[in-house]
Amino acid sequence: AKGTVSMNRLAMNAFGGRMSASGSYSTAADAQRPALKLKAEIADASFSTTFDQLDVVRRMVPLFEKTGGDYSMSLDLATRLTQTMDPDYATLQADGAIRSKNIRVQNIAVFDQLAAALKNDALRRIEAKDVDIRFTIRDGRIATQPFDLSVGGISLNLSGSTGLDQTIDYTARVTLPEGSAGGILTAGGRRHL
């Protein structure tokens, strides 16, 4: 269509890994607020490099700053762009999945509190393998489908969302090993990061 630029199977190195993308940029409906559609696959990228290089990640996924390891991701995204070519977060919608063979997260207040309550310092540093998290972005929030982690002998099932307002709203189902406090604990709520 007139006013639309399309790209197909564009490949590049990005974020310490590789990326391939197809999509379009269009001013056909509104020259002041161009429409961006993007389907991307990212492989072997660095959490910290992505955080350092993308403002949208710093705003929507501040947890990346405290995350080590590499990830792969599939993303299907649509948004309007502002006059400065930034995403218009009110129109941003996406579906995707992020996968990591080895992820490390530390210095998260909620996990520090959980470690103190359960007297298990292993919970202060999350190290998980074979993580697969499906997510959607709507209304300024990234919502994740329930996913499982095993940390310090404790099984966690997490689901919830993080927002542009720097809040995190997650529910955690914690299964403790036999011999500790034992049993299952469910906790949740909204906190500022």
Task: Name every feature range the model reports, one short phrase each.
Residues 2-193:
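Small-residue helix/turn framework positions
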